[in-house]
């Protein structure tokens, strides 16, 4: 007859009984004093063998083993029992679930005190067995250990002893223990008893207890009854780890001595609620409720009086809605680490932390709490050193009040990253900030960021700080930001930003790449003269569609790249660049003015790269720039190739001047000038011819004027200006 494992009946994340229900046709396990009782099954009506093993440490009485099939064995006056019994088919008590049960009793004769330790009962693998689960393998269903008079100690229910013995405790369903014991440890006692459904613990224990891993991986466990007096329990680490079917647990209020609750309920997928006892002595709650997917609420009646680690405590408990804390803690100097404590609690809507909780770190504390709308932090947390990722992707958060400033500098990196509904933030006085990267990245609704007087800064980088703050209309950087080295993408995609005030002391900034990229609203910006250290202006004003004018200060003498700096600034009319000395190190202007269709006045563009050895105004580096008709481009740099091809790259230039007449600038095999399909008039082309003629004895060069607007109006005399010098005109 087929055997249905208890595991198959009970292990379910969403269905099955909430408490243990014992089959009515099992033989009764009684509370017999001075006895150890087992109930086991044979997985079918077949011959099977059971081996018992006990260690007797005192006393001299005979040990009687009642095998439950009307036979007994007597072990006399020896310290150790190691007895094997073979059952005959047809004996035992049939069970409606399809197997036969046997009740084994182990007891004593005579008087006096005897002690049994290491009480084990194991199935013997029949020689005909080929795999676990074959009908010849027996399984213990229940176990009862008699009262403390005999002190029978259960140890290692899961152990495998010898190559021919298999642990039968994977199908153990119920365990009842003596009322009074003096055991000092339950560590790993029921570890991996996969089918264990209920355990009744002793009502009294006179010794200090360690429960670490006691029920670890008992994923069918439904019910655990602790004694009402549990004052001596000290270690609860990993006790219920992976008890996936445990739905509720009652922890006695007397369980107030435990120092370690780390990973206690880790992976209890169906646990709904827990009221914690006093945890005054606790120093570890790390991963205590990690990945408790159905957990709805937890109540803390007190908080530790010593420093405690709550890192990852509730992480990924996706259904957690409420955590009750006391209003205050009794020892405000005791620090609490909340690193990633509530990360991934997607149903958590509001939380109130004790007003004087001294949090040492808020790093990632509420990251991905997507339903969080309100969070009341402590009024002060002087030991806090980190706020990085605190509210990362809290997409429902509307407002937050930060605690008073801690004593040390703190990181705000990605603190509000992705808080798309956050509207206002005030940083209180006294904060010393050391990292501001991505702090308000994608805060689409942020309108106001206030720095109260007294905020100090040790910030060296503001990369992506306000990127994507669509509703931010103005911002004034504090004057104390004088050591910031990077503003890369700091204000990019701030679509409503109309004004920004930069401090006069940006002397440490080296990277302004994409700083204002995509700011379609503001029309002008004043850059401070202190930016002498800056080297990177790439994409700085990319797609600033409303920018009409810009003047770069004469102090930016170390810039090396303007790659796509004003790309897509289609309203830009005036751009004033610094002089030759300030632009001498520039080596990349690719796309610098691409799409600047309204640019009329461009000052000092001819000075770019004037002191470098590599020419810039070439097809590779210049042709992607586009200018409005009417602008004048004057070239000064060391040119070996000038390409302004209006057809291929839409370079809409009307006037080109060559200002450097040094013959040394025209070396190479066949350098040429290409102004094809530009809008240059006849007079402007003639003016360019005169510039070319002034190149001294440079001969055998080519100028291509095909398709240029004024090419058709050139006279023979006009052409002679350059051909008489040995130049060739194409077009």
Predicted segments with their positions:
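Short acidic/polar micro-motifs centered on Gly/Asp/Asn
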Residues: 43, 52-91, 98, 107-111
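Extracellular/surface recognition and adhesion modules
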Residues: 65, 541, 688-689, 722
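Structural signature of tandem-repeat unit edges
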Residues: 104-106, 114-159, 168-184, 193-209, ...
């Amino acid at each position: 007859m087929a055997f249905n494992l208890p595991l198959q009946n009970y292990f379910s994340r969403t269905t099955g009984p909430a408490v243990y229900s014992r089959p009515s046709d099992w033989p009764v396990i009684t509370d017999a004093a001075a006895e150890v009782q087992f109930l086991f099954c044979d997985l079918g009506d077949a011959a099977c063998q059971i081996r018992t093993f006990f260690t007797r440490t005192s006393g001299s009485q005979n040990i009687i083993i009642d095998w439950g099939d009307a036979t007994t064995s007597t072990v006399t006056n020896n310290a150790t029992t190691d007895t094997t019994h073979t059952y005959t088919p047809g004996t035992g008590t049939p069970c409606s679930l399809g197997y036969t049960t046997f009740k084994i009793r182990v007891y004593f004769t005579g008087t006096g005190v005897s002690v049994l330790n290491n009480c084990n009962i194991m199935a013997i693998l029949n020689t005909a067995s080929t795999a676990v689960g074959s009908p010849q393998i027996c399984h213990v269903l229940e176990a009862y250990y008699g009262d403390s008079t005999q002190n029978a100690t259960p140890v290692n229910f899961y152990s495998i002893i010898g190559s021919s013995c298999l642990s039968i405790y994977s199908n153990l369903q119920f365990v009842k223990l003596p009322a009074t014991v003096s055991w000092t440890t339950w560590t790993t006692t029921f570890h991996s008893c996969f089918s264990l459904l209920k355990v009744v613990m002793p009502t009294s224990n006179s010794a200090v207890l360690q429960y670490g891993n006691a029920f670890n991986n008992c994923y069918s466990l439904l019910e655990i009854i602790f004694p009402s007096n549990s004052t001596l329990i000290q270690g609860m680490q990993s006790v219920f780890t992976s008890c996936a079917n445990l739905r509720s647990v009652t922890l006695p209020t007397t369980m107030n001595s435990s120092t370690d609750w780390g990973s206690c309920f880790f992976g209890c997928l169906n646990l709904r609620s827990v009221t914690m006892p006093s945890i005054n002595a606790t120093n570890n709650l790390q991963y205590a409720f990690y990945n408790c997917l159905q957990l709805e609420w937890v109540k803390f009646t007190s908080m530790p009086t010593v420093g405690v680690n709550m890192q990852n405590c509730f992480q990924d408990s996706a259904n957690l809605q409420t955590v009750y804390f006391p209003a205050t803690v009794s020892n405000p100097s005791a620090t609490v680490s909340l690193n990633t404590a509530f990360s991934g609690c997607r149903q958590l809507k509001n939380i109130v932390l004790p007003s004087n909780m001294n949090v040492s770190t808020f790093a990632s504390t509420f990251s991905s709490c997507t339903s969080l709308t309100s969070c009341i932090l402590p009024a002060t947390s002087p030991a806090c050193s980190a706020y990085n990722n605190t509210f990362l992707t809290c997409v429902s958060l509307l407002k937050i009040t930060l605690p008073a400033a801690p004593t040390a500098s703190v990181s705000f990196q990605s603190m509000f990253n992705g808080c798309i509904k956050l509207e206002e933030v005030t940083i209180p006085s006294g904060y010393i900030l050391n990292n501001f990267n991505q702090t308000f990245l994608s805060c689409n609704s942020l309108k106001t960021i206030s720095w109260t007087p007294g905020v100090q800064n040790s910030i060296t980088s503001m990369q992506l700080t306000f990127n994507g703050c669509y509703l931010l209309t103005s911002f004034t950087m504090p004057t104390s930001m004088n050591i910031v080295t990077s503003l890369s993408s700091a204000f990019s995609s701030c679509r409503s930003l109309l004004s920004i005030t930069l401090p006069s002391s940006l002397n440490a900034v080296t990277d302004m790449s994409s700083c204002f990229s995509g700011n379609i609203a503001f029309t002008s910006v004043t850059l401070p003269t202190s930016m002498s250290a800056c080297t990177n202006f790439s994409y700085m004003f990319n797609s600033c569609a409303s920018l009409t004018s810009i003047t770069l200060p004469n102090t930016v003498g170390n810039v090396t790249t303007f790659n796509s700096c004003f790309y897509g600034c289609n309203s830009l009319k005036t751009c004033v660049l610094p002089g030759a000395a300030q632009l001498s190190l520039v080596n990349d202007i690719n796309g610098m003015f691409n799409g600047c269709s309204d640019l009329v006045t461009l000052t000092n563009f001819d000075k770019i790269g004037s002191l470098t050895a590599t020419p810039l105004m070439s097809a590779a580096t210049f042709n992607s720039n586009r200018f409005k008709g009417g602008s004048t481009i004057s070239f000064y740099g060391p040119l070996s190739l000038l390409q302004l091809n209006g057809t291929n790259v839409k370079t809409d230039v009307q006037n080109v001047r060559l200002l450097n007449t040094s013959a040394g600038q025209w070396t190479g095999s066949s350098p040429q000038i290409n102004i094809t399909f530009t809008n240059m008039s006849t007079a402007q082309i003639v003016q360019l011819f005169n510039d070319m003629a002034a190149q001294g004895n440079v001969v055998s060069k080519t100028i291509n004027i095909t398709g240029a607007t004024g090419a058709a109006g050139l006279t023979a005399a006009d052409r002679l200006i350059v051909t008489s010098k040995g130049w060739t005109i194409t077009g």
